Amino acid sequence: FVTTGVIKDGFGSMKASDTYYESGTGSTTYHPFSIKKRSAVQFNISAIDRNSGITYAHIEKKENGQWKRIDDTVKIKPASYDDDFVHGLTKGEYRLAIKAPTTQLNAVSYTSSSKSKKVAYKKSKAKKIKLDGQTSNIYTTGEKTSRWYKISITSTKKKRILNLGKNTVSG
């Protein structure tokens, strides 16, 4: 496939749903972005040149005027396309840190979808999941409390399957 874009070294701040191209510098470059409300933020970084080295990325949050790292480093292999990582982020100022070899070209983008905080923290207020229903939510960085859900079984003669899943990144 063929794609077009502008390669801009140190492209600076980022907007959701825009794709940026950056050639590696050998050192870390920072790309600020802001989150207006609690969201699931998905980053897509593609290391385009198959003959170049590995690209590394992580997220930092601005707290009390200082940048604080909030996750572990993500490793993007050469010629890998659509390497995504997702974070649950609260309102605030963030930046994406990327370190790539000087011979690597990276395509970078992110999308953000707001998530409500309508969850039950107590067993007595557990959120009901209906038959054939589903629910999803996020934990933002630093959240450690339990969430409660309940299901109702209407018949003892039918088998019901409960599928639980999780997607995680460290942070």
Task: Give the ranges of each region predicted by the language model.
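Extracellular and select intracellular beta-sandwich modules with Ser/Thr-enriched
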Residues: 104-108
